């Protein structure tokens, strides 16, 4: 049986209390997964009072491993299908003594095999957004804040999760006709320029 984020963080809290307390949380991934874990990072950087948080790309984490990585750190490492360098990042964190939470698409991935704790998330065309990688990275952040610092906005945050799927469904319904009209209007254009930016 898989554990809930609340249960996972409860076990981590017991370990950290014995080790001297949580000092740092690393969010590690690459590509779209790195963008997806940004909400958890941003939450902790903004709200945590007694520990800090940073992000690394998977390969950077493996080849320029932070010196403070040890048994008082948590590494939240995300990859849908277990990108090789991200699996290596989990192994690197394990070897340093950190607690690893492998966020991945299923219990059969390489990530699930090497993570100390595993959080699977919804993905694909029928994705449940309240259980997506973004939502779970944020959920881990809220749970760390609650259990380590008794975060005052925790209950409001948990209530908000019940609204996410309805909001997304309504948004899709409103935007679909606009998107279809745009696609029909510009379908024969010879060139498209796509501009994008990362989360930070």
Specify the residue positions occupied by each region the protein language model found.
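Short, flexible loop segments at the rims of nucleotide/cofactor-binding pockets, characterized by
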Residues: 2-7, 52-55, 77-80, 167-174
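Acidic catalytic cores of enzymes that act on phosphate-bearing nucleotides/polynucleotides
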Residues: 182, 186-200
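Structured N-terminal alpha/beta-domain signature
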Residues: 140, 176, 193-194
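Generic low-polarity alpha-helical segments
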Residues: 1-2, 31, 35, 169, ...
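Glycine-rich phosphate-binding loops that contact phosphosugars or nucleotide phosphates
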Residues: 20-161, 197
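A short, well-structured juxtamembrane/interface segment
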Residues: 3-21, 170-188
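Internal, active-site/partner-interface "lid" segment
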Residues: 144-184
